[in-house]
């Protein structure tokens, strides 16, 4: 069962909290427990009590029976009910038990079939007028309700927080923004120029105005001279860079023609458009190295594809196997004939370890039982340089 106020029967909620009367101990809301009195149970201290306990504690109990007598309407209803019971008991005394049960059922049916009292039009209008005349408190606004809820939750009320100012997005294009910035800078320069005559006027009022004028003339001459020197310096740097660029292009073209001659191509058909020219910011050595790398890669591709490679003359001496045998290892990195772990002379090659060389002891120690069974080995004999006869 939901807990309700003993005085107004309202439910206890978050906003309607439950309080207890210090005298009678019943549960009341804050509105019904608005009286204060000295309570003997609490050591004759001022406590919150209900209206009934406040009346008893302040005025004292009265022995007058008329004060506690029920209303007159209640007395009349009780008297009519007692008279009806007496008449029914006197009438039912002459009936049997079955007849009394039937009579009670008939009386109950008659009570149920009686038409209920319908209020008249005047009563309904009076009740509506009374409801309209009731004084209603002001309805709190949304802002007040949000502030109260924030206070209950322990937060800062929204009305006290500073809201950030709304800044509209900039819908201007980049060209418009640049133009506006230039206009702003022009206006600032104009303001600065307007402020300069005041300073010159203050200098004219000085007794040493002749010296000030000469100093200003000298400073202007020095500024113009420095601008001229800077202009000539920039022109000289541009000429040097242009000359370096031309020299670099000529060197790249010469290298490309030499490579074309080595390939057996016509060097007159080689142009700078066939190669990626370096940027002007690159160093000359870096650019040459990059172009050389590009040309070398192209030559390697041509050699791999067999395009435009001259045929090698067939050797006729007996030393051909030895030379062919020496060209392969010397073209690539020469293999070192010792163990890859202890640098002792290698005796076998392990195919399961990407062809690494081992001595017998390091091979046993570096392989477990599974590797010894799975890895295939072959004896290794270091290559010796052949002698021509």
From Swiss-Prot:
Q: Where is this motif: MIM1-B?
A: 252-265
Quaternary organization? Interacts (via MIM1-B) with VPS4A; interaction takes place at the midbody ring following cytokinesis checkpoint activation.
User: Where does each FYVE-type zinc finger lie?
Assistant: 1-58
Function according to Swiss-Prot or TrEMBL = Key regulator of abscission step in cytokinesis: part of the cytokinesis checkpoint, a process required to delay abscission to prevent both premature resolution of intercellular chromosome bridges and accumulation of DNA damage. Together with CHMP4C, required to retain abscission-competent VPS4 (VPS4A and/or VPS4B) at the midbody ring until abscission checkpoint signaling is terminated at late cytokinesis. Deactivation of AURKB results in dephosphorylation of CHMP4C followed by its dissociation from ZFYVE19/ANCHR and VPS4 and subsequent abscission.
A biological process (GO) of this protein is: mitotic cytokinesis checkpoint signaling
Could you tell me at which residue positions the Glycyl lysine isopeptide (Lys-Gly) (interchain with G-Cter in SUMO2) crosslink is annotated in this chain? 132
Q: Which domain of life is it from?
A: Eukaryota
Subcellular compartments: Cytoplasm, Cytoskeleton, Microtubule organizing center, Centrosome; Cleavage furrow; Midbody, Midbody ring
Q: Name one GO cellular component term.
A: cytoplasm
InterPro entries linked: Bbox1_ANCHR, Znf_FYVE, Znf_FYVE-rel, Znf_FYVE_PHD, Znf_RING/FYVE/PHD
Determine if Phosphoprotein is one of this entry's keywords.
yes
**Where does the record place a coiled coil?**
226-261
Chain positions with Phosphoserine modification: 69, 219, 280
Keywords carried by this UniProt record: Cell cycle, Cell division, Coiled coil, Cytoplasm, Cytoskeleton, Isopeptide bond, Lipid-binding, Metal-binding, Phosphoprotein, Ubl conjugation, Zinc, Zinc-finger
PROSITE patterns documented for this protein: ZF_FYVE
The record's annotation in Pfam families points to:
ANCHR-like_BBOX, FYVE
Q: What is this protein called?
A: Abscission/NoCut checkpoint regulator
Gene behind this protein: Zfyve19
- Where, by residue number, is the motif MIM1-A? 99-112
- Report residue spans for region: Disordered: 158-177, 204-227
Species annotation:
Mus musculus (Mouse)
What segments bear the compositional bias annotation Low complexity?
167-177
According to the UniProt entry, the note on domains is: The FYVE-type zinc finger mediates binding to phosphatidylinositol-3-phosphate (PtdIns(3)P).
From the UniProt record, which GO molecular function terms apply?
Answer: phosphatidylinositol-3-phosphate binding; zinc ion binding
Effect on the protein of changing residue 64 to S? In strain: FVB/N
| Polar residues bias (residue ranges) | 214-226
Binding annotation for Zn(2+) 1: 5, 8, 29, 32
């Amino acid at each position: 069962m939901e807990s309700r106020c003993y005085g107004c029967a309202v439910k206890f909620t978050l906003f309607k909290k439950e309080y207890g009367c210090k005298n009678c101990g019943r549960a009341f809301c804050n509105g019904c427990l608005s009286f204060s009195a000295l309570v003997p149970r609490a050591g004759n201290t001022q406590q919150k009590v209900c209206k009934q306990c406040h009346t008893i504690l302040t005025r004292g109990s009265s022995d007058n029976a008329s004060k506690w007598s029920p209303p007159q309407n209640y007395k009349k209803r009780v008297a009519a009910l007692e008279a009806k019971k007496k008449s029914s008991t006197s009438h039912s005394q002459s009936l049997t038990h079955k007849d009394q049960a039937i009579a009670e059922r008939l009386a109950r049916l008659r009570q149920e079939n009686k038409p209920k009292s319908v209020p008249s039009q005047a009563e309904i209008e009076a009740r509506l007028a009374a409801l309209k005349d009731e004084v209603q408190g002001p309805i709190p606004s949304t802002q007040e309700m949000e502030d109260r809820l924030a206070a209950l939750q322990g937060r800062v009320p929204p009305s006290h927080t500073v809201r950030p100012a709304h800044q509209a997005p900039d819908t201007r294009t980049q060209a418009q923004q640049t133009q506006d910035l230039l206009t702003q800078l022009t206006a600032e320069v104009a303001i600065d120029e307007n402020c300069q005559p005041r300073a010159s006027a203050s200098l004219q009022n000085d007794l040493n105005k002749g010296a000030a004028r000469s100093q200003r003339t000298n400073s202007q001459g020095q500024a113009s001279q420095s601008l001229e020197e800077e202009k000539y310096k920039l022109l000289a740097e541009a000429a040097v860079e242009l000359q370096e660029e031309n020299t670099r292009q000529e060197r790249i073209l010469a290298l490309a023609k030499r490579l074309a001659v080595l390939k057996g191509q016509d060097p007159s058909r080689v142009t700078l458009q066939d190669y990626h020219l370096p940027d002007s910011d690159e160093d000359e050595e870096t650019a040459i190295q990059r172009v050389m790398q590009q040309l070398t890669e192209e030559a390697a591709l041509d050699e791999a594809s067999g395009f435009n490679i001259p045929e090698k003359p067939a050797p006729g001496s007996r030393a051909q196997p030895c030379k062919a045998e020496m060209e392969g290892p010397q073209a690539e990195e020469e293999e070192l004939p010792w163990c890859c772990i202890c640098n002792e002379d290698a005796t076998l090659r392990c195919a399961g370890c990407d062809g690494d060389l081992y001595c017998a002891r390091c091979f046993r120690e570096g392989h477990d039982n599974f590797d010894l069974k799975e890895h295939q080995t072959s004896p290794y004999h270091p290559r010796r340089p052949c002698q021509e006869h």
